Regions:
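Hydrophobic, aromatic-rich transmembrane alpha-helices
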Residues: 14-17, 96-102, 313-350
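Extracytoplasmic catalytic/substrate-binding loops of multi-pass membrane glycan-assembly enzymes
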Residues: 34-52, 59-72, 80-83, 434-437
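Signature aromatic-anchored transmembrane alpha helix within multi-pass, membrane-resident enzymes
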Residues: 113-114, 161, 206-221, 396-425
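Hydrophobic/aromatic-rich transmembrane helices and adjacent perimembrane loops
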Residues: 139-142, 180, 365, 371-394
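Membrane-interface transmembrane helices that cradle and orient dolichyl/undecaprenyl
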Residues: 145-160
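Membrane-interface alpha helices of multi-pass inner-membrane proteins
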Residues: 161-178, 182, 187, 216-225
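Juxtamembrane membrane-water interface segments immediately following transmembrane helices
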Residues: 180, 211-284, 458-466
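Short periplasmic/luminal acceptor-recognition loop of GT-C membrane glycosyltransferases, typified by
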Residues: 446-526
Length: 569
């Protein structure tokens, strides 16, 4: 097996070979590079973390995993002046970059299969791109998982592989969203074991069997262990006991779906002197009025300031927000990986030309779908892809008469169907997405707004979830960065009805916008929505969609508080 690149023909290659022959120099070089690269992944690019760190605030970030939040909270209480979050993120980035660089240099200097080197580069590129597409995922978590996967490809001992597994799980605990990433990690390592066995053409796995079995045990136990840790964090941490507790903090509650909105809210909070918390743990706003009544803060909505008390509210548990957690179906994938790996270990593996393409397509499936799929109905075609890949990968399985080309073609067909079908339908119309009457009528509104490409400020009330509304808006080319789910805001301030009557506005769902603006603009006299949008958000809003139980009204703003009806049903 040749190295991916002719290293000795250039200065850079000679330098890498020199480092690979002297471990001490290699470690010094990697540590220096890791230190230099850390600012590129610092919290300066993350407005929420930067705000929490540099403002001296040590209250828990609600977007983080409860277990990690509990650790940060406990350490912060012990050392109030220590920037715990910054130090922890810096440490994670330092170790992750070190592991990534070491993996790449090992691939360049050693005679490793080119497919493993390509896999390493693809892993790094994917997590970098995914962090760009999904900025709510903290970069340190993505780096930790990518480095664990890449370093596993060059690990030769079970201790190193155990460390990679634990390091990956540590990255998962940084964010609550990362729990489901355990599933594709299992697939990644299963594919790597297949590559190693194909490369060495062994009848049995020998030294691979123990480390592989150990990894599977840890991975299978990871989901319930993380769930137990989450419950422990809820029970032990005063910040997560029965809901939300802002200890000596003043919180500006907002529902911006992305960090661009949060960045704007940070500017608002800086002007009002409020701390900002991303309110993404509530299913919807139906519990917010109850929370306000319990805290007796109806007239001071923008400054919920409760010292020593707990605000009772209903939180989304991980198994409710992420169907993969707490569900038995995802556990099938590690089990299937174990069975298929066992077959390959026991039987003689016959290397074929189609093995590498199968592995490549399997990686594409894992990357594109396993980490992003929340709908359980998609598990069936994904499982079929796994089976087809396994058939074409191992010619000694019972179904060896099926040509590898057919398996690859069917897998590509399934992938194309899942990728191109934005409605979530499965091939052949097995699963058909249905809309309620209200959602279908809202679709008419979206079609109308698509023909009028103004920047829209929309309330999605007819949709069951915000993600559903966001998907519809993207399909209709609306500005999703200016979409805010304001359902329930009109319940905050009953006294605002006087201003509605004075402006001859009868639609309560139009009132919620002005209430929403007045709520954020604490201390500002005028409730006008237009100056606020232009000044704070930079949005020159031309239309407002008010959707209530299937009925809609589209208003055009003429002046600060004058609205003209454009269209209604």
């Amino acid at each position: 097996m040749q190295t991916p690149f002719p290293l000795k023909e250039n200065i850079c290659g000679s330098f890498i070979l020199l480092l690979s022959r002297h471990p001490f120099l290699l470690n010094i070089f990697l540590l220096g590079c890791s230190f230099l690269f850390i600012p590129r992944f610092s919290t300066n690019d993350d407005p929420i973390l930067a705000y929490l760190i540099y403002s001296g605030s040590h209250h828990l970030a609600l977007c983080m995993h409860p277990l990690m939040s509990w650790i940060l909270h406990t350490v912060s209480l012990a050392s109030p002046e220590l920037p715990v979050l910054f130090l922890m993120e810096t440490l994670i980035n330092f170790v992750s970059i070190y592991l990534l660089l070491k993996s790449v240099i090992h691939h360049l200097s050693a005679k490793t299969p080119p497919i493993l080197f390509i896999f390493t580069i693809f892993t790094i590129s994917f997590y970098a791109l995914y962090n760009y597409i999904q900025p709510q995922f903290t970069q340190c978590a993505g780096l930790a998982m990518a480095s664990a996967i890449c370093f596993y490809t060059v690990s030769q001992t079970w201790k190193n592989r155990l460390f990679c597994t634990l390091w990956f799980l540590a990255g998962c605990t940084v964010r609550l969203d990362m729990i489901y990433a355990i599933i594709p990690f299992t697939g990644f390592l299963a594919l790597q074991e297949w590559i190693r066995l194909i490369q060495h053409k062994k009848n049995r796995a020998s030294h691979h069997s123990f480390s592989w079995s150990l990894f599977l045990v840890i991975t299978l136990a990871a989901i319930p262990l993380l769930s137990m840790g989450e419950k422990l964090a809820y029970n032990l941490s005063p910040g997560w006991e029965n809901g939300l507790h802002f200890n000596h903090q003043r919180a500006l509650i907002c529902d911006y779906p992305d960090y661009s909105g949060m960045d704007k809210s940070l500017e608002i909070s800086a002007q009002t002197g409020l701390s900002t918390v991303e309110w993404n743990m509530l299913k919807n706003f139906e519990y917010v009025p109850q929370l306000a009544q319990q805290t007796n803060m109806i007239d001071q909505l923008a400054s919920i300031h409760r010292e020593g008390n707990t605000m009772e509210t209903k939180m989304i548990h991980a198994k409710d927000h992420f169907p993969a957690v707490g569900n038995a179906i995802p556990l099938l994938f590690p089990i299937i990986g174990l069975l298929l790996t066992g077959m390959i270990c026991i039987r003689r593996v016959n290397y074929s030309f189609w093995s590498y393409p199968c592995i490549a397509f399997s990686l594409i499936i894992l990357f594109l779908f396993m980490g992003r799929v929340y709908n359980r109905v998609l598990y069936a075609p994904l499982l079929l892809c796994f089976v087809l890949m396994a058939i074409s990968l191992n010619n000694n399985i019972q179904w060896k008469k099926i040509p590898g080309k057919v398996c690859i073609f069917l897998s590509m067909l399934i992938m194309a169907g899942l990728f191109l079908n934005s409605q979530g339908k499965i091939l052949g119309g097995v699963i058909k997405r249905t809309f309620t009457k209200e959602q279908r009528e809202s679709k008419v509104v979206f079609d109308y707004l698509t023909m009028h490409p103004e920047k829209i400020f929309i309330s999605f009330d007819a949709f069951s979830t915000f993600e559903e509304a966001l998907a519809v808006s993207r399909r209709n080319f609306l500005r999703t960065d200016h979409v805010i789910n304001c359902t329930g805001w009109h319940m905050w301030n009953p006294t605002f009805q006087e201003q509605l009557d004075r402006n001859s506005i009868t639609d309560p769902y139009l009132a919620l916008y002005q209430d929403h603006v007045r709520f954020i603009q604490k201390g500002v006299e005028t409730p006008a929505i237009l100056p606020y949008l232009e000044h704070h958000l930079g949005i020159k809003t031309k239309a407002i969609l008010c959707d209530s139980l299937g009925s809609y009204r589209i208003y055009r703003i003429q002046k600060d508080t004058e609205f003209s009806l454009i269209k209604s049903n």
